Design a protein with these regions (language model features):
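Ser/Thr-glycine-rich phosphate-binding loops at phosphate-binding pockets of nucleotides
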Residues: 165, 169-170
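Cys-dependent protein tyrosine phosphatase-like superfamily
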Residues: 1-160, 173-175
């Protein structure tokens, strides 16, 4: 089902935002991503209305890749989508490889990670600098993005990948 006519067009839902069609973008070699095969978004738990559930089902998703931590997805579980296989692989990892948890209980761990980063560089750092360092490493050696590419290479489409807000972890996957 073709739902958008321009690359990155937002698909409107009553309960969720930043849900986008990724068809239409051009690759470096000039080829174009096909419409109706690749979607990105935020927390699906916000989809409450029958209209939202019907719209999501109309995309014909075969795969949903949840990039949130176990804590985030347990606190706000995805709704079942008919015909779609669900898998969760956290899109952000701590230095030791464990899941970076953005739920309430994970915030203290994030503070500890930042302090460890400050010790490693020998000075206090601004949050922007710390997150920039995380984002530079995020796409590499990350099981979440390996899972996304495996779905695409296996032609398990249409696929939706998402996190809590559909910006950071999801944005890296969209690049």
């Amino acid at each position: 089902m073709q739902v958008a006519f321009s690359p990155g067009a937002e698909i409107k839902f009553e309960g969720a935002n930043n849900f986008r069609e990724l068809g239409g973008y051009r690759a470096a070699d000039g080829r174009q991503v096909k419409y109706g095969l690749l979607y990105r978004g935020g927390n699906l738990d916000l989809l409450k209305s029958e209209a939202d559930h019907a719209r999501l089902a109309s995309l014909g998703l075969r795969e949903i890749l949840d990039l949130r931590s176990a804590g985030e997805s347990a606190a706000h579980p995805d709704p079942a989508v008919p015909g779609a296989h669900y898998q969760r692989v956290c899109g952000m990892r701590n230095v030791d490889g464990t899941e970076m948890d953005f739920s309430g209980q994970g915030i203290e761990r994030l503070r500890q990670e930042k302090k460890a980063f400050e010790r490693s560089v020998g000075r206090p750092v601004h949050d922007f600098e710390w997150f920039s360092a995380l984002y530079r490493e995020m796409p590499f050696r990350n099981p979440a993005y390996h899972a996304l590419f495996a779905l695409l290479e296996g032609r398990r489409v249409p696929v939706l990948f998402h996190c809590s807000c559909g910006k950071d972890r999801t944005g890296i996957g969209a690049m």
